[in-house]
């Protein structure tokens, strides 16, 4: 009996630092919920620029279809990766102790013409929204994944309806 083969990753998650690992966990959990294979790397745009360049230049050839890049402070990682790959890059600005993540957000969102980085929120919603955006990109041409996204959004709406009912009619 042969061992079960792990599917090749479609999404690459790249952290600028391992200190971002806890913050990015909801992203990985959401990708898992959608059954999207992914890989996780720690590569710094500033401390390991050669590795960042190699990762970006080989990502499409290795079968990745989307890159999620999380970085804080002088958060250049998403932009560096976007400048070197034809794949869509989603930037996740990490919260920082000095400016609360505003520095990260502005570093990621202010890209020059021709080098887009899709940017999500700082804080808890950012990693989850990055995974959902990656899923929506991948769902183009994948009806089963598209249906999983539709059902996810139905569950979100149901939770809001329950919360509304609870506040309108308290026990």
Predicted regions span which residues?
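Glycine-rich phosphate/pyrophosphate-binding loop and the adjoining helix
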Residues: 138-171
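Basic/polar N-terminal segments that are highly enriched at the extreme N-terminus
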Residues: 1-8, 171
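Glycine-rich phosphate/diphosphate-binding loop of Rossmann-like nucleotide-binding domains
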Residues: 8-47
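N-terminal beta-loop-helix "entrance" segment that forms/cooperates
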Residues: 40-61
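Glycine-rich phosphate-binding loop
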Residues: 55-97
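Short glycine/serine/threonine-rich phosphate/pyrophosphate-binding segments
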Residues: 20-24, 48-52, 71-80, 99-102, ...
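Short, glycine-/small-residue-rich phosphate/pyrophosphate-handling segment
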Residues: 97-147
């Amino acid at each position: 009996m042969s061992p079960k083969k792990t599917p090749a990753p479609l999404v690459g998650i790249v952290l600028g630092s391992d200190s971002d690992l806890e913050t990015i966990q909801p992203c990985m959990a959401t990708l898992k919920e959608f059954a999207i294979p992914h890989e996780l790397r720690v590569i710094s745009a500033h401390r390991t620029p050669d590795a960042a360049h190699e990762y970006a230049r080989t990502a499409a050839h290795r079968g990745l279809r989307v890159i999620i890049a999380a970085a804080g402070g002088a958060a250049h990682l998403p932009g560096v990766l976007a400048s070197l790959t034809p794949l869509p890059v989603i930037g996740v600005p990490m919260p920082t102790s000095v400016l609360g993540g505003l520095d990260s957000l502005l570093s990621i969102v202010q890209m020059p013409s021709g080098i887009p980085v899709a940017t999500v929120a700082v804080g808890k919603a950012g990693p989850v929204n990055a995974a959902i955006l990656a899923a929506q990109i991948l769902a183009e041409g994948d009806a089963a994944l598209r249906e999983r996204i539709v059902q996810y959004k139905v569950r979100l709406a149901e939770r809001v309806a329950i919360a509304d009912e609870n506040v309108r009619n308290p026990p």
